[in-house]
Amino acid sequence: MKQLLAIFALLLSSLPALAQNNAAAQANIIRPGDNLVLENIPAIPAAIAEKAFQYGEVRAAALQDWDGSRREMLIITRFADVPQVHVVKMPGGARTQLTFFPDRVGGAHYGPKGSNYFTFVKDVGGGEWFQFYRYDLADGNVTLLTDGKSRNTGRAFAHNDNRFAYSSTRRTGQDTDIWIMDATNPKTDRTLLQLEGGGWGATDWSPDNQKLLVLQEISANQSYLWLVDAASSEKKLLTPKAGAEEVAYSGGTFSKDGKGFYTTTDRDSEFKRLAYFDFATMKPAYLTPDTKWDVDEFDLSDDGRTLAFVANEDGVGKLYLMDTTTRKYHSVSGLPAGQVFGLSFHKDNLELGFVVNSASSPSDVYSLNVPTGKVERWTFSETGGLNTATFSTPQLIKWQTFDSKTISGYLYAPDPKKFPGKRPVIVNIHGGPEGQFRPGFLGRNNYYLNELGVALVFPNVRGSSGYGKSFLKQDNGMNRDHTHKDIGALLDWIRQSPNLDGGKIMITGGSYGGYMTWAVAYEYNGKICCSLPIVGPSNLVTLLEHTEAYRRDLRRVEYGDERDPKIREYLEKTAPLNNSEKIQKPVFAAVGKNDPRVPWTESRQMLDKLKGNGITIWFLMANDEGHGYAKKKNQDFLFYATVMFVRQFLLGENVSAAAK
C-alpha cells in the first residue's frame, strides 16, 4: 500500500513538469484557428514563421473614389484582419479607417456633390452574396440598402443624383435583373429590367439621367451593349451581331454631349481598342487604331474633354491621356514600371487618380495633375520592413509547345550570388481561365525567392487574355487539354534551362489554376515533385453541375456544355478526378467552405479518391472563407503550411515541429 502511495505521489509531483513541457511544446508550434479544418497537416514549427512572418506583413491600397467637393479620397486597405474603407485627405496623409467589419469591404463610392455619405459593398464569409450599404459621414451609421439575401453587383451612379442602377439575382437566384434605387431611401428600390442570364450590368447614365448603357456578357469573347430608357424600361440593342464574328465590349461611357459613347472592343481586331460610337450612325471610330495590345480600362473626365486609358503592353500597364476633341493622345511618364489600374478623375477635371503595382512595391494610390503632369503618391503601403529594392525583377520567357505555337510567361529568379547553381522551381498557373499573369509585386511569394532560393515561373498558356481574341479562344470546349500540354512543354523548357533544376518542380495555382494543377499532377506526374491546388475544380462536369446558378451558363461557354453527350464524354475523360490513380506525388489542397464558384467538394471528392494511392495528402479548409482567403489570419496559416510543404516535398528538408 505504501509503495502504491509512493508511486502516486511521484506521479503527482511530475504533473507540473509535464504541463510545463507540454506548454513549451505548444509554444513551439503554430496553432490553427478553430475556424480551420485540417487533415494530415503536421504541427507547423514556430521557427518557420520567424522569417516568413515579415513577408505577410505587407499592405496594399486601392483607390475607391474622390470626394466631389474636396481634395481627398476613399481607399481600401487592411490594418487588421480584412480590407476596410479608409479616407486619405492629402498625398502621403494618414489612412483613417471608417468601416470596421469582420468581413472584407469594397466598392466605396461617395454620394453626389454636397451629400454626406458613401455607399459600399460587403459579403459574409466569402460567399459573394454581395449587399450594398450606406455609410453616413456625420455619425458613422450604416444602413443596409439591399435585401440581405441576393447577389447584388455592378453599380452605376446617376450624375449629381442619389440614384444608382445595379444588378441583382433577387427574382430567380439565377438571372441578373437591373434595379434602380435612391441611396438615401431604400424604399425607392424598383426593378428596371427583368432579364435572362447572369451577365447583365449597367455601366453608365446619360448626361441627363434619362437613359442607361447596359452590358450583356455572354463570354469573354462575346458581349453586347444596350440602350435602356430609365423611365419606361424600353431597351434597344446597340451592337447587334454582324456575321459570324464574335465581338466583345468592355465598359460603356456616354460622351459629355450625350450624342455617343466610348467603349473598348475587339470588333474588327484581335485586340480591344478604344472606340467611340455615334448614336446617329452607330459606326465605330477607333481611337487607338495602331495599338497591338488590349486597352484594359478607361475613364472620362467630368467635363468630357480628357480620356485616360491603360494599354496592356505585354503585361505591363501604360497610362495614356487623350484629348477628346483632337483625339490625339500621349503616354504619361514618371510612373514605376508595372501594372496601372483603377482610373478615376476628380470632379475638378484636373486630377486623375490611379493605382500602381510594381515588382518592388505593392499596390499604392497615385494622382496625376493633368495640366502640369505632376505625379503625387497618396499612400505608402508598408512592406514588413523588407528591402523591396532587392526583390527579383521579372524576365519575359517564351517556349514552343506541342503544336509549334509560342507560349510566354514570366520568370522570377533568386539572386545567383546568394543561391548559386540550378534552382528549384515553383510553377504558378493563373485562374480565369481567361486571366493573365502580369508582372507586379509578389507579396508572400518573395519569401521563396529570397529565403529558399526557389525560382518562380508564371505561365500564360493558351486561353489567357492579353494576346488577342484568337489566342483567348484556343482552350475552349474540347481543346481544354491543349493547355495541359502547354505546361508539359514548359516543364521540358525548365529541364533544358542552365539555371533551373528540372528535377525539382512544384505545380500550384488557384481557381482554374487549381484545375490546371490537378491536371498537370496526373498528366506529368513523373516530371514534378508535388502539387498545391487552391480552390481548384477536379472535374469540370461536377463543377458545372454544382457552381452557383448565376454562373453556370457563363462557364458553359468556356468549358463546354456538359449536357451535350460528346462534350460530357470529353470532359469526363480528361477530368483529373477520373485520372486520380496517376497522381503519385504529395498533394496539398486548400479550399474555402463558402466558395460559390468552385464548391469545396471539388477538392474533397478528389482527395477521397487519392487516399487509395498511398501518397501524402494535406487538406486545409477555412469555414469562414470562399473563393480564396480574404482574412489575414487564414492567409498566414495557409502560407506557413505551404512553406513547410515546399521545404519538405520540393526541397527535401526534414521539417517537423521538433525542428529548430
Indicate where each model-derived feature is located.
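Short, solvent-exposed loop/turn segments at conserved positions within beta-propeller repeat blades
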Residues: R78-V82, G125-F130, R170-T176, I218-S223, ...
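N-terminal cap/lid segment of alpha/beta-hydrolase-fold proteins
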Residues: R377-P420
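Beta-strand-rich domains and repeat architectures in extracellular enzymes and scaffolds
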Residues: A47-H86, H109
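Short amphipathic alpha-helix adjacent to the substrate-entry channel of hydrolases
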Residues: G440-P459
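Short beta-strand element of the alpha/beta-hydrolase
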Residues: A413, P420-G431
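Blade-terminus and WD-like Trp-Asp/Gly-His loop motifs, strongest in beta-propeller folds
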Residues: L63-E72, A108-Y117, R155-R163, T203-K211, ...
